[in-house]
Swiss-Prot record:
NCBIfam families: bfr. This is Bacterioferritin BfrB. Belongs to the bacterioferritin family. Part of the iron-storage bacterioferritin (BFR) complex which stores about 50% of intracellular iron. Missing most of the residues required for di-iron cluster formation, it probably does not have ferroxidase activity. Disruption phenotype: No visible growth phenotype in iron-sufficient conditions (30 uM Fe(NO(3)3)), in low iron conditions (no more than 36 nM) cells grow at half the rate of wild-type. A double bfrA-bfrB deletion grows as well as the single gene deletions. Even in iron-sufficient media both single and double gene deletions have lower photosystem I content (PSI, which contains 12 Fe atoms), store about 50% wild-type levels of iron, and undergo iron-stress. It comes from Synechocystis sp. (strain ATCC 27184 / PCC 6803 / Kazusa). Heme b binds at M52. It is found in: Cytoplasm.
């Protein structure tokens, strides 16, 4: 089924953000693993895998609409060098993803493309959950102290 060019462009933009998220979360996971922060490693790794599955659903939708998924285009990775930077950069990235998803979902409504809207709505729901989790982690650091937070992240998730 041939789809609207603008719809495919919006889907490719969402794909670009998910591909960036895969890489950023995966690198952050492995950095946390290297530091012995097993629980944080597991969380970041799981989110990286979720982003990969979300990218897969976007790729399938672009192909269904007879477009070509762009897997070569990425945003700049926001790599943290400390745990607070990692959490802050992941939050910044997710807020950008959320803004892009909300914009694209509104566009799909105007085009009456409810399937593409639903694909992005599922991603939006998970993105908002990640934003909430990241904000909670920042709250924990500010209220319990970085040392206590890091100690809590050394165990298994």
């Amino acid at each position: 089924m041939e789809g609207n060019l603008e719809v495919r462009q919006h889907l490719n933009q969402a794909l670009k953000l998910q591909l960036t998220a895969i890489n950023q979360y995966f690198l952050h996971a492995r950095m946390c693993k290297n530091w012995g922060l097993n629980a944080l490693n597991q969380y970041e790794y799981k989110v990286s895998i979720k982003a990969m599955k979300q990218a897969d659903s976007l790729i399938e939708r672009v192909l269904f609409l007879e477009g070509l998924p762009n897997l070569q285009n990425l945003e700049k990775l926001l790599i943290g060098e400390t745990v607070p930077e990692i959490l802050g950069n992941d939050l910044t990235m997710n807020q950008g993803i959320r803004d892009g998803l909300v914009n694209s979902i509104a566009f799909f409504e105007t085009q009456r493309d409810y399937v593409s809207r639903d694909v992005l709505s599922e991603i939006l729901e998970e993105t908002e959950e990640q934003i909430d989790w990241l904000e909670s982690q920042q709250w924990l650091i500010s209220n319990s102290g970085l040392e206590n937070y890091l100690q809590s992240m050394m165990g298994e998730e």
